[in-house]
Amino acid sequence: MVAEPHSETSSTPRRRRWRTTAAVTLFTAVLAACGGGGGSGGGSAPNGDVPSNEPPPPVPSAPAAQPTTAADAVRLADQASFGPTEALVTTIKAQGAAAWVAAQMALPATSRYSSGQGDAIHTYTGTADFCTGRGDDCWRDWYSTSPLLWDFYRNAVGQPDQLRQRTAFALQQILVVSNLDVSGTYGFRNYHNNLLAYAFGNYRDVLRKVTLSPVMGDFLNNANNDKDAPNENYARELLQLFSIGTCELESDGSLKGGKCSPTYTNDTVRAYAYALTGWTYPAGGASRYGCWPKGANCTYYGGDMVKVDQYHDTKERQLLGGVKLASGHTADTALETVLDSVMNHPNTPPFIGKQLIQQLVSSNPSSAYVGRVSAAFAAGSYKGFGTGKRGDLAATVAAVLLDDEARTETPGRSAGKLREPVMMFTGVLRALDGTTDGDALGWWWGETMQQHVFRPPSVFNFYPPDYPVPGTTLVGPTFGIHNANTALNRLNFLVYLLDWGGSSATGSTVPGAVGTKVNLAAMSTDAANAGTLVDRLSMLALGRTLPATARTEVVKAVEASGSNAANRVKTAAYLVFGAPQYHVQR
């Protein structure tokens, strides 16, 4: 059993386990039978927050409603939201996939990051430690991403703009920054609000905001980069992770010529590093030690980085695709040329398109599927979605979700993906009418399951997109953080919600604390009939009933749990959401 969080006192009584040994034993039988082992929105923005002034992308014309099946509705909810609810499944069934995606893209962005403190950590000039007199939660509220994590989970569980949030979450796992290396709550708030704002915009605009982000500038050493000997970190990751990848690709994502031909050399990286010199923090920061280097701004995260001409390298530089920066160019010209060169590279559509498929739908998409998504990215349009401009994310996301391979009722053996911990947390909470303030899902469960949102271990995220599944020829990114301990802790998370009752708000210092808990009242209406209850939960979790043998065992366990409605629902929910079919999302 995983330990309780440090915020719990040793005097807190443990709740008695409701499951009998027999019920736990039955879980093993189920595994064998299965073939396997409230939003935080309003209020004024704290200092340093920068609202997006970009016009929203055009709303796609609404496709006609084409009702679909419950199985397809649950599958789409798994792919495009933070988990099915009965109300969401009903909506998707009535609208159909295309109409629902269009309706989601037309929704206003109700989810934004707003919790935490402002920019005073970068305007403070006093001699005492900044946190002196600011209470025990100073580091949490001013420096860490814990306040963003509260907003993330509150919005994921409760806000309606689900597709925008899922797309932004996919982007943040490609365009990675980490609170492990950079501190400043308000800066991370700006960075991730930009990903939400541009989720259905253009990938070129996303790359521009990321390149000019002072948080990214600190994370990958491009802020105040020395023109005489520039740090190459950001230039390398811009090419390797954020745009073209390391091997030349066909438009369907396969290796060009059947082997890895490098897309760039060290000289190429160096040329991009020189091209991206000359950017410093936005104005607004202060320090009692003064700003360094001379002529640059002090550390400050309240906006995009700004150019300092004297620190920009103006020599002729050769970029990819035959693009050349002429001698005497400006920092602005260099930036736009860099972005054009990577956006026009033939690798970018399949490289980014495949990662979006992996994040939303399937770890091992067919080359044909990647090719169709790549074509949508390149054309900027897909069946009425998009502006017709290369890199349009509305078109690309629509292509990912509406492709036949995503919508098929009979997915192939290599289709689907291991449900990542974040999606398990939110999926169970949403399915069981849960609420959360997010607090328990960070330092406790996020750390336990190796996916503490906003704190990936490196720029390579929590797991690489090409992580090999042992003993197979498949890749499974989420398997990079999956092992015997995390597999057991998936079940322990269900124990935490169903047996312990989750977490309460008592004693919490989280603003607007509600704890983390589920509400089983709606499911209790079917508790008297074990078969009906199990099927209702299975349809919500899987989009179908459990396989016959597994269903029989789960129904027996529910019937053996007694007549208490709550215990019957807990037993059924534990066994359904603990089943392998739930954790392997297909």
Question: What is the meaning of each model-derived region?
Answer:
Residues 144-148, 158-166:
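Amphipathic interfacial helices
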Residues 1-32:
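Sec-dependent bacterial lipoprotein signal peptides
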Residues 59-111:
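N-terminal mature-domain "stem" immediately C-terminal to a signal peptide or N-terminal signal-anchor/transmembrane
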